[in-house]
């Protein structure tokens, strides 16, 4: 329910307790989150927005994609929406470091629109360092680094965010 207030597992608050936040004191609910996202989008007026794809198999990533798409739909801003895919059984995970190999779309998803951006070796090194910053993710990041630090970035180009979830394969739950 969009108006339902949730309690933070970390702070145990139901409202934003930080005075320097965008909306101090606002309730933790969907409408407040969308309002803040729309405010940031209107303020920044981005030409591109990069967020997870809605068919990512990790529920947090799929939910983030939906939130971003809902926020964009509620503004007059029309940036290019690019999506990145992390969790799917259709992307091969390299167990050895293969930065010279290209990151390609999963075979069953190659008919969708994808865009690649070439990364220099220096940018690949910087990306590896940034991935290793997330201590809570380190057991996973080591394998992901090998799978995702490649010679290019790969982005999904959605046709229309509002209909995206109905035109793509459903997300399957991720086992942890």
Predicted regions and their residues:
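A conserved mid-domain beta-alpha-beta active-site/ligand-binding segment of alpha/beta enzyme cores
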Residues: 95-139
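Active-site beta-strand->loop->alpha-helix modules in alpha/beta enzyme cores, enriched
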Residues: 1-78, 125, 145-155, 161, ...
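Short, flexible loop segments at boundaries between secondary-structure elements
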Residues: 75-97
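Low-complexity, flexible helical/coil segments
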Residues: 83-90, 121-123, 151-154, 167
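Short, solvent-exposed loop/turn segments at secondary-structure junctions
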Residues: 54-57, 86-90, 136-137
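Surface-exposed patches in mature extracellular/periplasmic domains of secreted proteins
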Residues: 140-144
């Amino acid at each position: 329910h969009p108006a339902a207030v949730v309690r933070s597992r970390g702070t145990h608050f139901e409202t934003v307790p930080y005075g320097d936040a965008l909306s101090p004191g606002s309730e933790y609910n969907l409408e407040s989150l969308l309002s803040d996202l729309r405010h940031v989008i209107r303020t920044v007026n981005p030409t591109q927005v990069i967020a997870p794809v809605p068919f990512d198999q990790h529920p947090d990533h799929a939910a983030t994609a939906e939130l971003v798409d809902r926020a964009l739909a509620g503004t007059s801003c029309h940036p290019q929406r690019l999506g990145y895919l992390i969790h799917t059984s259709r992307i091969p995970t390299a167990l050895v470091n293969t930065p010279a190999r290209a990151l390609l779309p999963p075979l069953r998803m190659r008919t969708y629109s994808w865009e690649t951006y070439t990364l220099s070796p220096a940018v690949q090194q910087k990306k590896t360092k940034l991935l290793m910053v997330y201590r809570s993710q380190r057991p996973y990041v080591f394998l992901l680094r090998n799978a995702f630090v490649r010679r290019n970035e790969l982005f999904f180009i959605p046709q229309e965010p509002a209909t995206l979830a109905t035109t793509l394969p459903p997300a399957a739950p991720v086992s942890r």
